[in-house]
């Protein structure tokens, strides 16, 4: 951490949905840091009231209010944690004048462009967004097999194939997850999220074994939209008869990491974290594969 990041004062948390904000609060508190929380009304869990000592609610479009509250709290550096559903970002918000002006100026209307622009506005206001995994490094896996079982030859071939597909769709800001069977792409994530993508793949594959690959974006900005795997994903994989999961090492958060790996081991699911610069080459041999129409 830099000198600024080792300070216990001036910390804020911009909270979306899910467990991510709670984990950041716990991680920061373990280092003696008490965060002021700006919680998004449309997304953040009401239970944050019990977890945060200083909490303020704002709507998705209230950028000016959020900045004013952070100034009042003395926030100079902040973590953005928790999902904001992609379909809400441009369709469900009522922007204040500052956000409306920002939206009008965007060259492309996508999530990365918007949040990147918000980060620049915050920076101009003296509030620096930092790596959202800063307080959760034990939950970010290094390269290697995380479960008792390593992917077998079939799964390794599907992982190699899936990495190529996933890299392509993530570079186009379509999604970050693909589901593969016998080196055929069964499902590609869009706005529905990883778990729904796996469920859809199960319906399409009709019992064929599946492999799930989830990657980061090229040049992943660790301040926001970091890939996350949680217990519900492993549960969904189990239901879908998915037998292996590959994620990016150093760029993925595994919520409830110990329990997640135990659950995967119990289900016979192999999990491998792969260094983006050292991806395995796709095997040359062919296999029958699933028919694609």
Question: How would you label these PLM feature ranges?
Answer:
Residues 2-40:
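N-terminal basic/disordered segments at the start of proteins
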Residues 6-10, 31-34, 52-53, 73-76, ...:
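Short coil/turn connectors at secondary-structure junctions
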Residues 13-15, 37-38, 78-81, 111, ...:
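General beta-strand structural signal in soluble alpha/beta enzymes
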Residues 17, 83-86, 184, 217-218:
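Short glycine-rich anion-binding loops that position phosphate/pyrophosphate groups of nucleotides
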Residues 28, 42, 128-234:
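Conserved mixed alpha/beta catalytic, RNA-binding, or beta-rich assembly cores of soluble enzyme
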Residues 33, 38, 48, 58-92, ...:
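Conserved alpha/beta cores of soluble small-molecule-handling proteins
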Residues 40-75, 92-101, 196-293:
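Feature captures the catalytic cores and cofactor-binding loops of soluble hydro-lyases/lyases
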Residues 94-150:
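Hydrophobic alpha-helical segments and helix pairs
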């Amino acid at each position: 951490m830099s000198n600024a990041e080792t300070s216990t004062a001036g910390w804020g948390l911009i909270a979306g949905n899910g467990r991510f904000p709670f984990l950041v609060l716990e991680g920061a508190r373990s280092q003696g840091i008490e965060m002021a929380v700006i919680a998004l009304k449309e997304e953040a869990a009401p239970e944050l009231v019990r977890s945060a000592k200083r909490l303020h609610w704002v709507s998705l479009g209230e950028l000016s209010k959020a900045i004013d509250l952070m100034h009042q709290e003395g926030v100079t550096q902040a973590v953005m944690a928790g999902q904001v559903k992609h379909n809400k970002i441009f369709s469900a918000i009522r922007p204040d004048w500052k956000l409306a002006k920002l939206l009008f100026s965007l060259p492309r209307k996508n999530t990365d462009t918007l949040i990147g622009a918000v980060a620049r506005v915050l920076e101009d206001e003296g509030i620096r967004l930092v790596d959202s995994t800063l307080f959760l490094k034990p939950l970010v896996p290094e390269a290697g097999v995380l479960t008792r079982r390593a992917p077998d030859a079939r799964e390794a071939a599907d992982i190699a194939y899936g990495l190529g597909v996933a890299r392509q769709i993530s570079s186009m800001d379509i999604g970050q997850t693909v589901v593969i069977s016998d080196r055929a792409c069964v499902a590609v994530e869009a706005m529905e999220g990883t778990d729904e993508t796996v469920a859809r793949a199960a319906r399409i594959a009709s019992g064929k074994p599946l492999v799930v690959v989830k990657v980061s974006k090229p040049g992943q900005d660790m301040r926001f939209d970091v890939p996350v795997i949680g217990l519900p994903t492993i549960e969904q994989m189990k239901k879908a008869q998915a037998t292996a999961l590959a994620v990016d090492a150093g760029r993925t958060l595994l919520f409830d990491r110990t329990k997640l790996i135990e659950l995967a081991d119990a289900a016979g699911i192999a999990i491998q974290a792969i260094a983006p610069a050292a991806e395995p080459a796709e095997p040359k041999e062919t296999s029958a594969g699933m028919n694609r129409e």
